[in-house]
């Protein structure tokens, strides 16, 4: 089975558990960014976390996770939507941090002082909902759990794991999201809490047993129902038209100056690294469009 997510619910309706495998898409995204080993692990955790939270969205909604801190990575953005599409960008893909007690030092490469901002486009045409919390550990999973408890008042446990092969490429990547829903049976909640504490290392568990084994261990003696298994995939969504709209926002004067002085412009997507080239004639045409649009908007404003 390729990258996927499984949504499940206890028979009592009080415990929701999601598990995911994002190894393939994480490997591709790390390749596109030329990510260092430690950044690859950070990206893997971020992508797994984004996929898990994206699975909670309603149709037509999307979210963005922005981690900003004082480490050499500086910033990581993960976006996910209700269809199962995810993408990510990092400010400094080659950043590194010395291992800490034999483990990947994700907190060291991201930075221990910083913030997590979650933006949700609810598909209603208004401003996105946004919530911000301080990073509590900079290990990604704990920070997402803290956000869910603090900003969305949903007690949650998030476990994320990733591992590299001998060539330094992602070989395993995934995780789980456990949430206690209103009216949860305390005995069931305590059993699942104990199950989480008893889990073997997550990357080893995913490698040997996959998401199904992870799900079984999380519920263990708690009866549950699998609600859905959904494909996850990397999709950027950028395109030349979107880049043109971004350039138009610069205004006619700046675009004309770029066309006459620079003679060209190259715009690279921060998520998929696709480059879009614009020559002098194309920049001048965009400048004329931007100028005409501004004149039209000013005229419309005067008519009101």
Curated annotation (Swiss-Prot):
Question: What GO terms in the biological process aspect are recorded for it?
Answer: protein refolding
Q: Would you tell me the protein name for this molecule?
A: 33 kDa chaperonin
State one molecular function term (GO): unfolded protein binding
> Its family?
Belongs to the HSP33 family.
Q: What species is given as this protein's source? A: Pelobacter propionicus (strain DSM 2379 / NBRC 103807 / OttBd1)
Pfam hit, one: HSP33
> What's one GO-annotated cellular component?
cytoplasm
Which CDD domains did the record assign? Answer: Hsp33
Does the keyword Isomerase feature in the UniProt annotation? no
> What HAMAP family does the annotation carry?
HslO
The organism sits in which domain of life? Bacteria
Q: Where is the protein situated, by its record's location annotation?
A: Cytoplasm
Question: Main location per UniProt?
Answer: cytoplasm
């Amino acid at each position: 089975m390729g990258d996927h997510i499984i949504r499940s619910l206890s028979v009592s309706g009080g415990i929701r558990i999601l598990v995911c495998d994002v190894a393939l898409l994480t490997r591709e995204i790390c390749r596109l960014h030329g990510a260092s080993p430690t950044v690859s692990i950070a990206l893997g955790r971020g992508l797994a976390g984004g996929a898990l939270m994206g699975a909670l969205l309603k149709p037509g909604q999307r979210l963005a996770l922005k981690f900003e801190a004082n480490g050499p990575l500086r910033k990581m953005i993960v976006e996910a939507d209700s269809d199962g599409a995810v993408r990510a960008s990092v400010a400094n893909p080659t950043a590194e941090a010395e291992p800490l007690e034999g483990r990947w030092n994700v907190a060291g490469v991201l930075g221990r002082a910083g913030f997590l901002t979650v933006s949700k486009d609810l598909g209603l045409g208004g401003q996105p909902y946004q919530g911000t919390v301080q990073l509590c550990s900079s290990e990604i999973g704990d920070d997402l759990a803290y956000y869910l408890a603090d900003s969305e008042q949903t007690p949650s446990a998030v476990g994320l794991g990733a591992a590299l092969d001998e060539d330094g490429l992602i070989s395993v990547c995934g995780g789980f999201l456990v949430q206690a829903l209103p009216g949860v049976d305390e005995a069931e909640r305590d059993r699942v809490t104990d199950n989480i504490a008893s889990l073997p290392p997550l990357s080893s568990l995913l490698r040997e047993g996959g998401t199904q084994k992870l799900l079984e261990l999380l519920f263990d003696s708690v009866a549950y129902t699998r609600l859905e298994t959904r494909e996850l995939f990397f999709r950027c969504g950028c395109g030349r038209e979107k880049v043109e709209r971004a350039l138009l926002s610069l205004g006619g004067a700046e675009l004309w100056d770029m066309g006459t002085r620079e003679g060209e412009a190259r715009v690279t997507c921060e998520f998929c690294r696709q480059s879009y080239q614009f020559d002098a004639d194309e920049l001048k045409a965009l400048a004329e469009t931007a100028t005409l649009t501004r004149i039209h908007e000013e005229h419309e404003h005067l008519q009101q």
